[in-house]
């Protein structure tokens, strides 16, 4: 159930649902079941949605948001995650969940998957159901291919459909992220005939040392001039590329002030923010504070 009620008192301290960046994204093939084989590098940033939870003795799961229309997809994943954990653990109580939605939908930042992961991690802790991280990741994978990396909570090289994870430590750079005013459908990108699907598969050490790119970028910038314009502007200030299937693009900076200086010059018709790369996610840090 979804409600537009405002946030209540007597709830848990907020749990972050961080954004991720795909520092590179290669499409190496397509399986018989239609899913695409990927090689990608996930890193978290300190820009997040926030969720609050109030545990109840009654079995209802109720989601509250003041932005219910614009976050319908995320709402659905949050409730699906809560129901999946409740079903697996046979937990008899429920929860009221409050969502503060800050991450854009259809931006390639993983907002919906991150919301689902935070719901699983937080409710597992608050319900004291004691499900292992590996089992939580299995439950998360049924909700979306990106959910396990958010549950894992560490920057990772990923293969398969994105679920095979190897922990890595890329530089924790500063990023200027631009949010074009367009929603890009992940499904539409992966179904498009012009998407490259034959990038050679490389070992992790080779991938970590080469110039990084995103196989979805050419298609998306061709279809969405807002994304192309954002990249054209940003690349003047820093090495830049698209995250995920877009629409967000990011430029990489060594120091925060460099990113802030570029942000100050952002054209009036563009929106963006500065964020810090994090190899341990804000969610993982929050969990360790319990």
Swiss-Prot record:
Coiled coil: none annotated. SUPFAM superfamilies: GHMP Kinase, C-terminal domain, Ribosomal protein S5 domain 2-like. GO terms for molecular function: 4-(cytidine 5'-diphospho)-2-C-methyl-D-erythritol kinase activity; ATP binding. Pfam families: GHMP_kinases_C, GHMP_kinases_N. InterPro entries: GHMP_kinase_C_dom, GHMP_kinase_C_sf, GHMP_kinase_N_dom, IspE, Ribosomal_Su5_D2-typ_SF, Ribsml_uS5_D2-typ_fold_subgr. ATP binds at residues 104-114. Its EC number is 2.7.1.148. Keywords: ATP-binding, Isoprene biosynthesis, Kinase, Nucleotide-binding, Transferase. It catalyses: 4-CDP-2-C-methyl-D-erythritol + ATP = 4-CDP-2-C-methyl-D-erythritol 2-phosphate + ADP + H(+). Pathway: Isoprenoid biosynthesis; isopentenyl diphosphate biosynthesis via DXP pathway; isopentenyl diphosphate from 1-deoxy-D-xylulose 5-phosphate: step 3/6. It comes from the Bacteria. The active site is at residues 20, 146. It is an enzyme of class 2 (transferase). One of its GO terms (biological process) is terpenoid biosynthetic process. Belongs to the GHMP kinase family. IspE subfamily. PANTHER family: 4-DIPHOSPHOCYTIDYL-2-C-METHYL-D-ERYTHRITOL KINASE, CHLOROPLASTIC. Catalyzes the phosphorylation of the position 2 hydroxy group of 4-diphosphocytidyl-2C-methyl-D-erythritol. This is 4-diphosphocytidyl-2-C-methyl-D-erythritol kinase.
């Amino acid at each position: 159930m979804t409600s537009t009620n405002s946030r209540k008192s007597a709830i848990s301290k907020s749990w972050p649902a961080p954004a991720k960046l795909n520092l590179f994204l290669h499409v190496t093939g397509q399986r018989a079941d239609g899913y695409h084989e990927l090689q990608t590098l996930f890193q978290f940033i300190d820009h997040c949605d926030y969720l609050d939870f109030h545990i109840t003795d009654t079995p209802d799961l109720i989601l509250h948001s003041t932005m219910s229309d614009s976050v319908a997809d995320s709402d659905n994943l949050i409730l699906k995650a809560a129901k999946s954990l409740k079903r697996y653990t046979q937990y008899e109580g429920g929860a009221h969940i409050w969502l503060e939605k800050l991450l854009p939908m259809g931006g390639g930042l993983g907002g919906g998957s991150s919301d689902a992961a935070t719901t699983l991690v937080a409710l597992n802790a608050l319900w004291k159901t004691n499900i292992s991280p590996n089992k939580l990741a299995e439950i998360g994978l049924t909700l979306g291919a990106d959910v396990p990396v958010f549950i894992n909570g560490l920057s990772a090289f990923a293969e398969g459909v994105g679920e095979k994870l190897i922990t890595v430590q890329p530089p924790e750079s500063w990023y200027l992220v631009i949010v074009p005013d367009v929603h890009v459908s992940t499904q539409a990108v992966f179904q498009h005939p012009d998407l490259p699907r034959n990038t050679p598969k490389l070992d992790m050490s080779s991938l970590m040392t080469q110039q990084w790119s995103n196989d979805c970028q050419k298609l998306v910038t061709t279809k969405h001039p807002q994304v192309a314009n954002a990249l054209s502007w940003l690349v003047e200030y820093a090495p830049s590329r698209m995250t995920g299937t877009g629409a967000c693009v990011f430029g990489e900076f060594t120091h925060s002030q460099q990113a802030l200086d570029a942000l100050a010059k952002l054209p009036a018709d563009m929106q963006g923010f500065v964020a810090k790369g994090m190899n341990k996610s804000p969610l993982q840090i929050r969990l360790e504070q319990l």
